Amino acid sequence: MSMTDNVADMLTRIRNAYKSKLINVSFPSSKIKTSILDVLQKEGYIKDYVTTQKNNISYAEVALKYSVNGDASICEIHRVSKPGKRVYSAIKALKGYYNNMGIYILSTPYGVMSDREAHIKNVGGEVICKVF
């Protein structure tokens, strides 16, 4: 069975791993997925990730981040732009997610970045997902 939305699959695996209190989660890797993981790591939502090769397929293994009392660093992670309905936004139209406590991850002409970085560079793009 082929997958139509690989990014949504990655986000679902991360969400389910946090709900199950897992330490690590792995899934097939791609350029867009590693770009999203870079943003999540830079913003402090995950500890680290490593890409490995097994049987000519690259996998990403993500080390999830929890607080001292065991709370997940990601409460919500949702896909915004889907294959059937792409969502594009100018940076001025994006308001802060959860009063600037969460982030939007955008795919811009300058690469994948958070809405905070996009505000600094004054560039909009496709809204991939939102994280809180």
From Swiss-Prot:
GO terms for molecular function: rRNA binding; structural constituent of ribosome. The keyword RNA-binding applies. InterPro entries: Ribosomal_uS8, Ribosomal_uS8_CS, Ribosomal_uS8_sf. It comes from the Bacteria. GO terms for cellular component: ribonucleoprotein complex; ribosome. Keywords: Ribonucleoprotein, Ribosomal protein, RNA-binding, rRNA-binding. Belongs to the universal ribosomal protein uS8 family. Part of the 30S ribosomal subunit. Contacts proteins S5 and S12. This is Small ribosomal subunit protein uS8. It comes from Rickettsia akari (strain Hartford).
